[in-house]
Swiss-Prot record:
GO biological process terms held by the UniProt record: establishment of protein localization; flagellated sperm motility; protein localization
Family: Belongs to the AKAP110 family.
Modified residues (Phosphoserine): 215, 410, 641
Gene source species: Bos taurus
Phosphotyrosine carried by residues: 411
Protein name: A-kinase anchor protein 3
GO MF annotation terms: protein kinase A binding
GO cellular component: acrosomal vesicle; cytoplasm; sperm fibrous sheath; sperm principal piece
Gene (UniProt): AKAP3
Biased composition (Basic and acidic residues): 226-242, 620-630
Pfam families per UniProt: AKAP_110 (PF05716)
Stretches the record annotates as PKA-RII subunit binding domain: 131-144
InterPro entries referenced in this protein's UniProt entry, alphabetically: AKAP_110 (IPR020799), AKAP_110_C (IPR018292), SPHK1-interactor_AKAP_110 (IPR008382)
């Protein structure tokens, strides 16, 4: 469809409207509960309330999808469906506000659905133990955070670092510095991980009632809270010093046997360094990776699970501990994440710093980098050569078409480097591929409005043909007078010429070109490529016809040719017998002879080009028989199917290269914009030929050539600018009809689905809760009009809404029966809106709704 659509003048017919009803195999379960829509009905500004609505809706949606996935009576994974209140299912919600002083902040919301695996009937008390386990962790965290808040308010001190630990074992809290304790945490975590501990959770005292789930005797539970406060020089708006606060909460395993730790069957002292030179590289790497993963998992996972567990209760709970936890988390959310990342990166830096001293590890990294670098060497050289080529060779302004010979020279120039070295062959190939892409992009720029692609292609074809023709003439020594002649077409009019040859052996029947066997219309390929090829042939035949006439064309013959040249995609312009070729007079001056010779050059060029590319076949006419045949009857050529264009591969002579080039141009796929430019250029060519005729076209047409004769479709404005304002009524009408026929045919072909593919259904489902009935009806009518303009056969509406579909169904049936167009429907809608606005301005009430009014007045 054209980019510029005149909706009010569109002549496209309206489509039908139907109610979408799914088949038996497609049950329709489109339901939206009122509770789910409450978010849209009640525009609350409280983010916590909105998030609680969203959580409930997600829970219901997830439960609904699970019910659909497992139908009643079926088993899911070999077990019966659990009820909605099963404690093994749970939703974890995490949302916090990052609002800070001086910035609006952002609200973060995360939700995850978790289903615990079924553990059998022997673990009935696991849910209770799990609640106590997380409650114990939560209590420790809340107590530590509340203690921090109280101490902060009482003391008011700053620049302090507090390290609080809750020990569940028998050992007293060690009196050590914070950095030493942090380093020991990492060392002990790596040591504990290497002992293949079976449990993945840290059970506290009283966490598990079952004896099988008790913790090993050599492990104890440790909960650590680290609080940092850093004072900055700036002062806040309330004259209080601003401080950055962060806390770090961690729960890890600790070994009771702090003195010894068995590893790999050996006994090593616990105070040994984690990285020893005598350790094997594989054990060293495995212990490092396990330590990092255990450290990150114990810090991040345990803390976030505790937070999400708490926030699940916080939606409906208003206890003091929950409120304090909420305030603390929202206040310190950024500091928590920042401190976690900082701590992890510091430990990772220490690990990598030690790894860089290991020669085996460094050599492995170097080998890996070298392997990846060698694989990317071709791409790197490709980019370098492409850049070098663009700097050296691509400085000229891009042309639409380049010479094929120029392309091959550029490729060989760059690819000759290092041809003898077998290692550089793939690099040369990559550079050639890169150049091909660059040249392809350069050779197909966006066509400028003042010069279309077809005009540039025609100029290039004429220049190439003249060059080849002069080379052949110079070799044979036939025409020496044309060596210094200009390669431009004279602009002034030619005098009428008598009927004998133009200075070269020519027979009138040669103009018609070898006659092809006409094919049936259903065998032709009606696509954009065939349209473009036929338009090119039409343009070339029009130029050839004008050259043969010598500037004196019969007006009636031109009108017949213009009216029938482009109405069908597989036929060329009509060439009547009355408008056959004419010849120059004998004894003309040298200037006229030179012009006639130049005209003969162009004529022979186009004739040979068409015969060797478009009309070439096995049963073409013999040249000798053509010369001997003096029959005046000349039939118009018929363009063959585009599938026969491959027969031009065996051409010879001076036009072999030109034939191959034009065939390659015609065989490429052309887009819709290219076809539009072709049609525009052919129409302009017809007008130029019409204006250059000696006989005025005004004698055949009427005096009315205003805007009323223009069709109402999207016709190019440039073509209207070429049309004369005086005395070209008939020519303008015929050209417009021809262009309109092509435009309509292309639209009808593009709207049809491919063979063997059913057209997809277009289904519209509108959900407007707070809108008025008037706006709903207007929206449905505009959707119907847009679907009609896009050639949608039937528009389906799903879900009845206040009887709008029934009225629209009746309206569409009446409009299709009356033959109404899209423009007429839109004009009626505008009329109704104007009347409604006038009634509202006066104070009257509109009696009829939009659909009812259209039923009466459309």
């Amino acid at each position: 469809m054209s980019d510029r659509v005149d909706w009010l003048q569109s002549q496209n017919g309206v489509c039908k409207v139907d109610v979408y009803s799914p088949g038996d195999s497609q049950p329709q379960d489109w339901k939206m509960s009122d509770e789910s829509l409450s978010i849209f009905k009640e525009a609350s500004h409280d983010p916590i309330r909105v998030l609680s609505w969203l959580r409930r809706d997600l829970e219901k949606s997830t439960a609904g999808f699970q019910d659909i996935r497992f139908k009643p009576g079926e088993s899911s994974l070999g077990r019966e469906m659990v009820s909605s209140g099963d404690p093994r299912k749970g939703f974890c919600v995490d949302y916090y506000n990052t609002t800070s002083r001086g910035s609006p902040g952002r609200l973060h919301f995360e939700m995850s659905h978790r289903e615990n695996p079924h553990q059998g009937p022997t673990c009935n008390g696991s849910s209770v133990d799990e609640v106590s386990f997380y409650a114990n962790r939560l209590t420790n965290l809340v107590i530590a955070m509340a203690r921090k808040e109280i101490n902060e308010k009482i003391d008011g001190s700053e620049n302090r670092c507090v390290h609080q630990s809750v020990y569940m074992g028998d050992e007293p809290p060690p009196n050590k510095s914070l950095s030493k304790v942090a380093s020991e945490l990492v060392n002990e975590t790596v040591t504990a991980c290497s002992k293949n501990t079976p449990s993945d959770k840290a059970p506290g005292s009283g966490d598990r009632a079952s004896g099988t789930l008790q913790s090993p005797p050599n492990l104890k539970y440790k909960s650590t809270l680290k609080i940092k406060e850093s004072n900055k020089g700036g002062r806040g708006p309330d004259d209080r010093p601003s401080s950055k606060k962060s806390f770090f909460y961690k729960e890890v395993f600790e070994s009771r046997n702090a003195g010894d730790a068995k590893e790999g069957g050996r006994t090593l002292p616990a105070e040994r360094k984690m990285f020893r030179g005598y350790e094997r590289p594989d054990d060293f790497t495995a212990s490092i990776s396990q330590g990092i993963m255990t450290y990150a998992n114990s810090v991040v996972s345990d803390m976030m699970v505790s937070i999400m567990k708490t926030l699940k209760i916080q939606v409906k709970d208003t206890t003091i501990a929950t409120i304090v936890l909420k305030k603390v988390l929202i206040k310190h959310a950024k500091e928590v994440v920042s401190d976690l990342i900082d701590s992890f990166m510091k430990n990772l830096h220490n690990v990598t710093g030690t790894l860089m001293t290991d020669t085996d590890f460094v050599s492995a990294v170097k080998r890996s980098f070298f392997s990846h670098g060698s694989q990317k060497a071709t791409d790197i050289m490709d980019a370098m050569l492409g850049k070098l080529y663009s700097v050296i060779f691509a400085k000229k302004p891009p042309e639409t078409v380049r010479k094929t010979k120029d392309k091959s020279e550029s490729y060989s120039l760059v690819s000759m480097k290092g041809m003898g070295d077998p290692k550089h062959r793939n690099v040369n190939f990559a550079s050639m591929k890169s150049e091909g892409k660059v040249r392809e992009r350069v050779c197909t720029p966006t066509p400028k409005p003042e010069k279309s692609c077809v005009e540039t292609l025609g100029e290039h074809i004429i220049k190439e043909g003249l060059t080849l023709w002069h080379n052949s003439q110079q070799k044979e020594g036939i025409s020496a007078c044309l060596q210094g002649s200009p390669f431009v077409t004279p602009k002034r009019q030619y005098k009428p010429v008598p009927d004998f040859p133009l200075g070269f052996p020519f027979d009138p029947c040669n103009f018609s070109l070898p006659m092809q066997c006409p094919e049936k219309p259903e065998n032709f390929m009606c696509d954009s490529d065939s349209w473009a090829k036929d338009l090119l042939v039409s343009a070339l035949l029009l130029i050839q016809y004008h050259l043969a006439q010598g500037g004196n064309m019969d007006a009636q013959s031109f009108l017949e040719a213009a009216g029938t040249s482009n109405l069908y995609p597989t036929k060329s312009p009509a060439v009547s017998h009355e408008s056959s070729l004419r010849s120059p007079q004998v004894g003309a001056d040298p200037e006229e002879v030179e012009k006639k010779d130049l005209m003969s050059v162009f004529f022979n060029l186009i004739r040979n080009l068409l015969s060797e590319t478009i009309f070439k076949s096995d049963h073409s006419c013999d040249p000798k028989a053509t010369k001997e045949d003096n029959s005046p009857q000349c039939e118009r050529p018929v363009t063959p199917s585009p599938a026969k264009l491959n027969e031009c591969d065996e051409t010879g002579g001076a036009f072999a290269g030109l034939t191959k080039m034009v065939a390659n141009k015609l065989d490429g796929h052309m887009n819709g914009q290219m076809v539009d430019h072709l049609m525009d250029s052919v129409m302009k060519l017809c007008l130029i030929i019409a204006k250059s005729c000696d006989s005025p076209l005004a004698e055949l047409g009427d005096d009315k050539s205003g805007d009323a004769s223009r069709p109402t479709s999207a016709f190019p404005e440039s073509l209207y600018e070429c049309l004369s304002t005086k005395g070209t009524g008939t020519a303008e009408t015929l050209l417009q009809n021809a262009y309109q026929a092509i435009h309509n045919e292309l639209r009808s072909l593009s709207a049809q689905p491919p063979e063997g593919c059913t057209a997809p259904k277009v289904i519209v489902s509108n959900h407007n809760l707070t809108d008025t009935v008037q706006n709903k009806q207007l929206q449905a009518v505009l959707q119907w009009v847009a679907a009609s303009e896009l050639n949608v056969p039937i528009l389906y509406f799903a879900g009845d809404d206040e009887g709008i579909q029934e009225k629209l169904l009746q309206l569409s049936a009446a409009a299709v029966e009356k033959g109404r167009s899209v423009g007429e429907v839109l004009q009626s809608v505008l009329r109704y809106e104007k009347e409604r606005q006038l009634d509202e301005a006066v104070g009257n009430v509109t009696r009829l709704q939009l659909l009812d009014w259209l039923m009466v007045n459309l």
